[in-house]
Every structure is written in structure tokens, then in C-alpha cells.
């Protein structure tokens, strides 16, 4: 699905972020809301050879994997007017060209019981992507994250900021995949930090 197909005839658009977009959207938006989408789980299964790694040592970043009866929490950003075209151009380079993500339309459910869902655009990497890494053990993922760095910074920052977002913005939500990788990473780097 092309983003242009989603925005045709619309005056506003919601964009759902579940990885670095939750703390670093880097585009103008009217407002943002914390909430979730259904039918997807967040996994550190996608490679990153630009933002958080390189060709020799790709970092690990999140993508969404379809699964019934689960949800993924994040932030949806509403863009309006000229912000729609500007944000889609920017995100096309950031997520699609450099990250290999595809776009899909999903229902976003804002936190709170009395708010109806809104349609949102989300970027998802699939196993067809050449830099898709797929499943690995918690320890393998943490070890890879510990040593990778790209143009946007260290892969460690990506993981820790995402975990911090979940603790601060979604304190009642458990994300075992995310938090187990964070714990494994901290166990790996703690001796290095203490020795410094």
C-alpha cells in the first residue's frame, strides 16, 4: 500500500510509531496520542544497516509480526494539511528507503475507554526484506545491539529509549520481549561500565 493512497482526499492522517518514532519523530505534527494497535507484536527482528548499524554489523530494530490476540503500544501522530506530504516524504526516506519498511493501514486505539479507534499508517518490515534478520535468542539480540552503531547513534540508545518510553508512557503494559532484551543488554554492558 502506498501512503498516497491512504491520504487521497483526506485533510489529516495518523501515523503510528512503535520504535524510534515514539521518542524521535523528527517531523511536524498537530498532536500525538499514546495507544495501541491490535493483531501485532513488536519484535527486534529487523536489521538496520544505516541508522543503528552498518553493512558489516547491522543493528537490530523493531518490526511488527502479525499474531492474534496481542497488541502493540506506541504513539500515533496526527499530521494535517502540508504536514501530511512533508511527513510522508521524510518517513519514506527514513523508514522505506533506508529501512526497507512497507506501509499498512491499521486501526489505532487511543489510551482511554471513551475514544474510538482511528485509521493510522504504520511502517512494517517483512521477512522479504533483504536486511530482515528474523528471530534469535534474547542473548543473541542483546549482544548484537551492544556492539552496533549507525548514522543515528548507538543501537543501545534505541533499545533503552524504547524501554524507557514503555515504562513512562505505558506503565501498566508488560512487553516481555523488549524488557528481557533490555535486561540481557544491561547484564552484558554493566561489567564494562563498572570497569571504566
From Swiss-Prot:
Subcellular locations according to the entry: Cytoplasm, Cytosol; Golgi apparatus, trans-Golgi network
Query: At which positions is substrate bound?
Result: 15-20
Entries under SUPFAM superfamilies matching the protein? Gamma-glutamyl cyclotransferase-like
Q: Which residues form a coiled coil?
A: none
Residues making up the signal peptide according to the UniProt record: none
Alphabetized, the UniProt keywords read: Apoptosis, Cytoplasm, Golgi apparatus, Lyase, Neurogenesis, Notch signaling pathway, Unfolded protein response
CDD domains reported for this sequence: GGCT_like (cd06661)
Q: Quick check: keyword Lyase in the entry?
A: yes
The GO annotation for biological process reads: apoptotic process; glutathione catabolic process; negative regulation of Notch signaling pathway; negative regulation of protein processing; neurogenesis; Notch signaling pathway; response to unfolded protein
What's the chief localization of this chain?
cytoplasm
Checking PANTHER family in the record gives: CATION TRANSPORT PROTEIN CHAC-RELATED, GLUTATHIONE-SPECIFIC GAMMA-GLUTAMYLCYCLOTRANSFERASE 1
Its job: Catalyzes the cleavage of glutathione into 5-oxo-L-proline and a Cys-Gly dipeptide. Acts specifically on glutathione, but not on other gamma-glutamyl peptides. Glutathione depletion is an important factor for apoptosis initiation and execution. Acts as a pro-apoptotic component of the unfolded protein response pathway by mediating the pro-apoptotic effects of the ATF4-ATF3-DDIT3/CHOP cascade.
Q: What name has this protein been given in UniProt?
A: Glutathione-specific gamma-glutamylcyclotransferase 1
Query: What lineage does the source organism belong to?
Result: Eukaryota, Metazoa, Chordata, Craniata, Vertebrata
* Gene this chain is encoded by: chac1
Amino acid at each position: 500500500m502506498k501512503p498516497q493512497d491512504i491520504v487521497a482526499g483526506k485533510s489529516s492522517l495518523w501515523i503510528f510509531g512503535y520504535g524510534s518514532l515514539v521518542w524521535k519523530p523528527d517531523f511536524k505534527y498537530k498532536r500525538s496520542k499514546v495507544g495501541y494497535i491490535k493483531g501485532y507484536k513488536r519484535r527486534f527482528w529487523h536489521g538496520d544497516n544505516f541508522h543503528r548499524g552498518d553493512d558489516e554489523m547491522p543493528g537490530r530494530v523493531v518490526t511488527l509480526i502479525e499474531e492474534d490476540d496481542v497488541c502493540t503500544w506506541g504513539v500515533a501522530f496526527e499530521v494535517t494539511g502540508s504536514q501530511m506530504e512533508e511527513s510522508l516524504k521524510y518517513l519514506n526516506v527514513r523508514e522505506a528507503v533506508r529501512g526497507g519498511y512497507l506501509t499498512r493501514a491499521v486501526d489505532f486505539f487511543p489510551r482511554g475507554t471513551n475514544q474510538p479507534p482511528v485509521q493510522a499508517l504504520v511502517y512494517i518490515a517483512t521477512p522479504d526484506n533483504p536486511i530482515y534478520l528474523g528471530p534469535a535468542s534474547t542473548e543473541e539480540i542483546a549482544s548484537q545491539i551492544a556492539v552496533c552503531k549507525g548514522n543515528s547513534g548507538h543501537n543501545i540508545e534505541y533499545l533503552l529509549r524504547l524501554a524507557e518510553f514503555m515504562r513512562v508512557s505505558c506503565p501498566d503494559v508488560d512487553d516481555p520481549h523488549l524488557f528481557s532484551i533490555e535486561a540481557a543488554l544491561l547484564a552484558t554492558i554493566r561489567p564494562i561500565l563498572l570497569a571504566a
